[in-house]
């Protein structure tokens, strides 16, 4: 038994080493004074200074954060509402909707990206033709009206694409919490005089919050990390951070990329730590309240 315990710990240590060794090497070489990715030339912060002075990177970072935050918020709201709606359906209808929801999760990103690009291009052209037809009407000319409903690939199409592929992840994260929820809790709140909104906000939502937070984190991570779908739906005027990194890597892997990747990793890590600490405090508070009651 003791030998098996040692072997299992050794195996676990090797797994974690395999997973995190590349990240530690990347972080270390982001402070390398040499441009080489194999030879250590001393400690420096120059690559971080150059990164902060790179306008293309900063612009892409701003776009990435704007798209990721907006897409995450919208996808979390829509996905949570959809998960609650699925839970109230009959089994056959629910299974059918869940099967449709799972298709984007298993679908290749390149297929999703190309199909969404074609949809946006087709829709933009159809709206442009419709605008032209409206402008050709005599009543529009008499009223001095000019219609233009057309659009090109850009920030809006990128945002819609991110919302679309984020929603299924939120649904999958929230559904297990809904299944664990005791339906009598909301009914008891209604019996005590609470409105449906108050019962949902005070009783149901706190129970679902761990799943909602997990879905939010997954959606944000998927959105900020996405390259393939963004590449096909962003157009030529908008660039995300992953697209800028790709263009930089095509030339050569510079220490600036190491510095940028390090900052992204640290930001996500800090976000996870803050959320986990918050959840731990909430769980401890609930246990204390349960003991008091």
Task: Report the location of each language-model feature.
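Hydrophobic alpha-helical transmembrane segments of multipass integral membrane proteins
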Residues: 58, 62, 66-78, 82, ...
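Periplasmic/extracellular loop-to-transmembrane helix junction in inner-membrane transport proteins
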Residues: 35-71, 250-251
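Transmembrane alpha-helices
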Residues: 11, 16-23, 103, 107, ...
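Transmembrane-helix boundary motif in ABC transporter permease subunits
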Residues: 1-6, 70-101, 118-122, 273-280
């Amino acid at each position: 038994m003791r030998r098996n315990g040692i072997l299992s710990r050794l195996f676990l240590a090797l797994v974690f080493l395999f997973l995190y060794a590349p990240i530690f090497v990347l972080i270390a070489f982001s402070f390398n004074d040499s441009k080489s990715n194999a030879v250590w030339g001393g400690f420096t912060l120059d690559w971080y200074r150059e990164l902060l002075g790179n306008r293309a990177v900063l612009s892409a970072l701003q776009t990435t954060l704007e798209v990721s935050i907006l897409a995450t918020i919208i996808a979390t709201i829509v996905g949570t509402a959809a998960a609650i709606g699925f839970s109230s359906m009959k089994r056959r209808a629910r299974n059918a909707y869940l099967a449709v929801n799972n298709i984007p999760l298993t679908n290749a990103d390149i297929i999703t990206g190309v199909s969404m690009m074609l949809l946006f291009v087709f829709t933009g052209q159809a709206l442009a033709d419709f605008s032209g037809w409206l402008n050709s009407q005599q009543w529009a000319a008499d009223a001095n009206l000019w219609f233009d409903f057309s659009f090109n690939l850009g920030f809006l199409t990128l945002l819609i694409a991110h919302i679309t592929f984020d929603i299924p992840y939120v649904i999958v994260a929230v559904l297990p919490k809904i299944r664990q929820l005791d339906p009598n809790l909301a009914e008891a709140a209604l019996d005590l005089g609470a409105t449906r909104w108050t019962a949902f906000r005070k009783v149901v939502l706190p129970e679902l919050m761990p799943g909602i937070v997990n879905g939010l984190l997954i959606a944000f991570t998927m959105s900020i990390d996405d390259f393939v779908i963004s590449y096909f739906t962003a157009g030529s005027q908008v660039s995300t951070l992953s697209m800028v990194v790709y263009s930089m890597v095509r030339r050569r892997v510079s220490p600036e990329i190491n510095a940028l990747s390090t900052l992204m990793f640290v930001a996500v890590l800090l976000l996870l730590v803050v959320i986990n600490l918050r959840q731990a405090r909430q769980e401890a508070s609930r246990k204390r309240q349960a003991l008091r009651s």
